[in-house]
């Protein structure tokens, strides 16, 4: 799954990287610890030249009241689920990221958080689905992040990972038909990802500053930074 995200690239660099302009109310602020229920900056298929903020958690269209929503959708079965069916059919999006976080519980012990990132790309895109929930008194644009089977790097940490898109597939993801998009939902090549242990500061969403991404001292953490390559 993907239960925590970050995006701390400079706004000008973000706009250049995705050839899109930030239009979100409130502008853009670097975030080191984005939790479910927060807003994610995303790029939708309807406005591929804009970066806007959407509530992280897709709210079922039948919900009578707003709720946190569903933060992840399994790419293998999203088209079969009533809650995602319409979004899968016609509402793909890109979710920019500077790195996501995952927790590993070795031998049933305390969960150890990891930061997973691309060393050669200060911002990459995860695949998502967006929707707009409409209530009696409010309208909430919302998003869920798609997941897939883990690559070899992620397999040692968790049994799922977000769908990370190669840069040359990002525009295709937004424009493709549903069958083609499903073909793009593959584990990202492990040689292009790195991971390292971080402190449990990330466990508290209120900790949202650069200290969150600092590596643990290798002598204390045991595993340290690693990559499958």
Briefly describe each language-model feature range:
Residues 1-229:
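Short linear sequence motif anchored by a di-proline
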């Amino acid at each position: 799954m993907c239960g925590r995200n970050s995006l701390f690239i400079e706004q000008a660099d973000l706009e250049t990287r995705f050839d899109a302009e930030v239009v979100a109310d409130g502008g853009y602020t670097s975030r080191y610890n984005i939790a479910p229920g927060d807003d994610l900056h995303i790029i939708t298929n309807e406005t591929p030249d804009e970066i806007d903020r959407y509530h992280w958690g897709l709210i079922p269209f039948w919900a009578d009241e707003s709720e946190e929503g569903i933060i992840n959708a399994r790419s293998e079965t999203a088209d079969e689920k009533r809650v995602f069916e319409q979004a899968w059919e016609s509402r793909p999006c890109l979710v920019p990221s500077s790195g996501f976080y995952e927790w590993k519980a070795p031998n049933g012990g305390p969960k150890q958080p990891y930061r997973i990132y691309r060393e050669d790309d200060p911002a990459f895109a995860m695949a998502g689905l967006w929707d707009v929930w409409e209530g009696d008194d409010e309208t909430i644009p919302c998003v869920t992040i798609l997941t897939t089977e883990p690559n070899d790097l992620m397999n040692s940490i968790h049994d799922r990972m977000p769908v990370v898109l190669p840069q040359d597939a990002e525009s295709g993801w937004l424009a493709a038909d549903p069958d083609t998009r499903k073909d793009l939902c593959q584990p990202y090549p492990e040689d292009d990802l790195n991971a390292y242990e971080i402190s449990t500061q990330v466990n508290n969403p209120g900790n949202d500053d650069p200290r969150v991404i600092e590596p643990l001292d290798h002598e204390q953490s045991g595993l340290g930074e690693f990559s499958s390559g």
